[in-house]
Amino acid sequence: MNRRKFLSVSAASMFAGALAPRLRSDAPAPAASGMNYAPRGKPHPVVKPGEFPIAAVRLDHGHIYGICNGLTEAGATIKWVYDPDPRKVAAFRAQFPQAQPARSLEQVLADPEIKLVAAAAVTSERGPLGCQVLAAGKDYFTDKAPFTTLEQLAQARAVVASTGRKFFVYYSERLHNEAGMFATDLMTQGVIGRVIQVVSLAPHRLSKASRPAWFFERDKFGGILCDIGSHQFEQFLTYTAATDAKITHAVIGNFANPDHPQFEDFGEACLVGNTQALNYVRVDWFTPDGLSTWGDGRTFILGTKGTIELRKYVDVARDDTTDHVYITDEKGEHRIDVAGKVGYRFFGQFILDCLNRTEIAMTQAHAFKAAELSLLAQAQAQRLVTSAAS
């Protein structure tokens, strides 16, 4: 059975009948802040030990742990870790003791064994760092958002074209979420017909006291649509099979953080894809402390033959477990709990793409288009005059 047929059969088998109730231990422990979102799955190595050596550098964001969880579960070996702050290196090695501390980034890039460099630098530094990595002959995997300016994106596209290396992005709200990946398979099968609209609601908990200073500086974090919005635009492109889109509306605001006037705690945007599908995105930093996890992220997909709702991280006041998929179609109503049943196949596919120079996990054009849309939405957004910003 080929891979595509296997995925189709696997998704169809879960959709065909109600799944047995899953234990709470099947779900990842909820993180207080999305910055610490680092799912752990079951190991499914696609390479032998030592066959895919990687390095982790610039540990400015906690997503580096999620990136490395996914890669090591797929068989990658972390050979080096580097950050100017030795405390970050020590914390990283506590979870990944196999990683040896490098003296410098240059030492990492000079190692001919290293095939991939993973990073979670300050957002404004991710694009230039990636170009440096690619120029050294390595593939690059960065946390989102990969860029804060369109100029950085243009430079990265040029370096990818000249080097042939991969510049990939950790769009974790789909790639590292089982409900999100299950929906990917459902779209491939056409379960709800042609997709008309995708609505993404992406609230996050701010946890202000734990955030570094750069997180609140506009030139460094890029803006809320550039940051959290990049996840949502990537999902829209995937679920609608669109390869491009136009921004028709974008708004940003700072409603509750006057102590950080450059910060944006709310944003929304509307898009029309080149498939004529529509997208509405709402992103915010207003998850209340009473919620059991960092955000009640939801995705609503409207098709010509049904609807899909993803309750990714919690089912509020009903079930504090994760990865709930609700489907309505011509046959009825369905709830499918997919935690522990889908896995995180992107990482293994990505490793094989790096080795085989293929594009099974995701195309380079797709990764860059999601980033481009987030940058365009941010640039076109009307900034609301609020009491916090005035």
Located regions from the model:
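A contiguous active-site-proximal alpha/beta segment in oxidoreductase catalytic domains
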Residues: F147-A209
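Active-site loop of classical SDR/Rossmann-like NAD(P)-dependent oxidoreductases
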Residues: G62, R87, R318, D337-G348
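Beta-loop-alpha module in the N-terminal Rossmann-like domain of NAD(P)-dependent dehydrogenases
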Residues: D60, F96-V159
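Contiguous beta-strand/loop segments that form the cofactor/metal-binding neighborhood of enzyme cores
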Residues: G34-P39, H44-P45, E234-V316, F346-T358
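N-terminal Rossmann-like dinucleotide-binding module
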Residues: S25-F96, S390
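Hydrophobic residues in well-ordered beta-strands that form the structural core
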Residues: A56, T142, T149, F167-V169, ...
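C-terminal helix-rich "cap/oligomerization" subdomain common to oxidoreductases
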Residues: S8-K48, L116-A118, N274, Q349-S390
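Mid-domain beta-loop-alpha active-site segment that forms a flexible
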Residues: Y170-E178, S207-A245, P261-F266, H366-A367
